[in-house]
Amino acid sequence: MAFRLKLVPEKTNIDFFRWQFLTFGLSTFLALASIVVLFLNGLNFGIDFRGGTTIRTESTQSVDVGAYREALQPLNLGDVAITEVFDPTFGPEQNVAQVRISAQDGAEAVTPETVNAVEAALQEVDPSITFPSVESVGPKVSGELVMTAVYAVAASLAAISFYIWLRFEWQFAMGALVSLVHDVLITMGVFALFQIKFDLTTIAALLTILGYSINDTVVVFDRLRENLMKYKKMPLREVMNLSVNETLSRTVMTSGTTLIALIALLVLGGDVIRGFVFAITFGIVIGTYSSVYVAKNVVLWLGVKRDWSKQPTDEVAAQFRDAP
Amino acid sequence: MLHIDRWKRILIIGLCVLGLAWAMPNLFYKRVEAHNDAVAAIEAAGGSATPEQQAAEAGWPGWLPSDLVNLGLDLRGGAHLLAEVNTTEVYKSRMDAMWPEIRQRLADQRATIGSIRRVEAPEGVLRIEIEQPDQIAAAVSAVRELATPVASLTGAGSSDIEVSAEGRTLTVQLSDAEKRATDDRTVQQSLEIVRRRVDEVGTREPTILRQGSDRILIQVPGIGSAGELKALIGTTAKLTFNPVVATGSDPQSSAGVGNVILPDTENPDFYYTLEETPVVTGEELTNAVPGTDQNGQPAVDFTFNPSGARKFGAYTSANVGQPFAIVLDDEVVSAPVIRQAITTGSGQISGSMDFDGANRLAVLLRAGALPAELTFLEERTIGPELGQDSIDAGRIASLVGLLAVIGLMVASYGLFGVFASVALLINLGLIFGVLSAIGATLTLPGIAGIVLTIGMAVDANVLVFERIREELRTARGPARAIERGYENAMSAIVDANITTLIIAGILFMLGSGPVKGFAVTLSIGIITSVFTAIWVTRLLMITWFERRRPKTIEV
């Protein structure tokens, strides 16, 4: 017997419903808490969604946030946020900061004068400073991007539910929908709680999470459908447990490979896409959890058609066949 | 039993080889890029090549594929602008141009409608008061005779102007159908002009696209800053030559009918009163090049086309000793006095400009004027170093992720894990091959998409392997187990990947720039990973099985 790494024992018999008040309760609590946090803290929208300018600065001298702020004070730019950026991929002489300026009142278009003034003021503080990236988004576009993002998430949810409904049953579609909303809400809650920058790429990350989470859920559903045909007399709850147990090894393995690859990117991929990668990584964990603990609970509550082998019109014949 | 038809084997291997061949140039990115640039330059020069170009061209054999993955702005560095065309501006000039015609038409009927007068109105609307309110119907029908049908598919059947009357006031404006048609034309023209201007500067692979009804997206790799790009495309560059009526220092003084007061470029307190109708416009230029004036100062030399030259010659010979103004974007650049008739059809613009300015003005005049002003809604500049840092970080992260996944797969599934890893490597190659072949753009989130694919690509294999393990437990022999494993895993693989593809499709529609790049790599990754995970691993597995004929297998 050659050595095999087994993340999950060959045969498991875990009762996934045993603690369902705890697990589903926790999910419900986290989802509700996320809504509360979203309302209390709000999301830390990037310029994609609220307009404004971000300037990335890089210098051989260490970043002095106070001095930067003082230099920008006389320009009267309103809300200015300056943060130093740290990253393991930076060299020793690489000191990076991010300056964010909110959209200027009454200016629909982006004003290059503002950017030039900011750059000049910062150069005064630190002559070696350079500006590797400058991005400005006008309030008009940012308003539209918010709507596009909302539509995209809604359209994805609708399209996936519809597909699941076609391929399975409406109860499965509801289960998938609930677990997807759960994933999106909690991920957004984490973004609101830690005030991580939320921009267009975060939306892309959210959609990716949807894709991954549904992928996981579908594998469980597929096995469930198969087992429902195989074990016609077994209570639904047990068929579900059996299906999750049978696919558990695959679920853990796939999440494992995906997480390993993503963690490599999270650590080594640089700070520019860290928020994006963080959202996906977090979402994969929560998505895996929800496909095991959320989606099928909903299906269990809604109940499901038990006889998959025949058309409903065959009921009479089925009765005869099943008769002793 | 386990079997793959010979033609399927050839097809699978052929597709892999083809994909990898298309991907290969990306391993020698710099060299192939130099080769491609040299080939394009030599072709543009009509076959003649400098020694450097010849060397660059020889750096990559011509018979090999030479398509590369385009790097997005966030990886290559460059400028991105989103501009909105102020289409309503054109309505005003259309109505202003119509006024003399309408005035003429109404003047012909002076006997019945009495005297007429143009009154204050919002931009793009013409209001005319007539003396005899009871004759307003006659005035309306007279103006309506000037209407022409709208020249567009959607607006067919409607006329270009709308005439209405209230009391003694006549209101004329463009009809909605004509406005739509005009908007469309204005944006098309602007797009064309922007493209010509960017091409004149000769940067590599600019992207200039129309977005929505009235926006233009401009992406130029390798340009230093968005400001530089804006200076080039944000200027309207409307050049006219107008007769000078008077000069003065009061911009508020009354200009008189048909005249305008415009400021001087150099002296802000100096104003010219000009006739509004130009003698010649920039549209009649055939060429403009930077040069120097008699004092050695930077200037732009221009040449008129024959009809422009004729008009200019006629005007100058009739007005020797009079000044005329060269007007650029509503500012008087200079107002020389005509010393003698200029019949050669060429001239010079001099004034306050440096050599860069002269160069830029020449480019702008050659490319033509924008029909309407552009407003910039979004602008992004990414420095090339930042892009290179991102590429390096992405490369290291992908490698580490790849090795970790391979390690985990081999540790978990042994020899079968090796098969899956080989398929994974081929999958990576295929992603790059497809990206190169379809000329897609790789962005930073796109790299994340590839890393995500590395992790998720093995999913189909994991599903199959887990199934084979289960089937082995029921002990029906290894060949049967492998076959059943594939059969039973198929529906899960298909459903799981189609749902992900749906998401990728929506992402593509939502996306601008980087997000779109992510959607593209994700979609390609899904398709190639299903192909490699199902067919390539199966081929490897079956080939191994046929050679060894193992009695038992261990997954």
Regions picked out by a protein language model, each given a short descriptive name:
Chain A
Residues 1-324:
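A structural signal for conserved, well-ordered secondary-structure elements
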